[in-house]
């Protein structure tokens, strides 16, 4: 199978509304739902939840 099918690149957008994004890869078999990760948002200088954007 192609690499892109198993581990697609996804954008994680800040829930703080700053528009800051991270780009990462996820495994669809382990995480079929949207990812929500706590990451650092340098715009507001805090750790906030980042949600997968579709």
Curated annotation (Swiss-Prot):
UniProt keyword terms in alphabetical order: Ribonucleoprotein, Ribosomal protein
SUPFAM superfamilies (UniProt xref): Zn-binding ribosomal proteins (SSF57829)
PROSITE patterns, alphabetized: RIBOSOMAL_L33 (PS00582)
InterPro entries assigned: Ribosomal_bL33, Ribosomal_bL33_CS, Ribosomal_bL33_sf, Ribosomal_zn-bd
GO biological process per UniProt: translation
Stretches assigned to coiled coil: none
Domain of life, source organism: Bacteria
N-terminal signal peptide: none
UniProt similarity note: Belongs to the bacterial ribosomal protein bL33 family.
Name by which UniProt lists this protein: Large ribosomal subunit protein bL33A
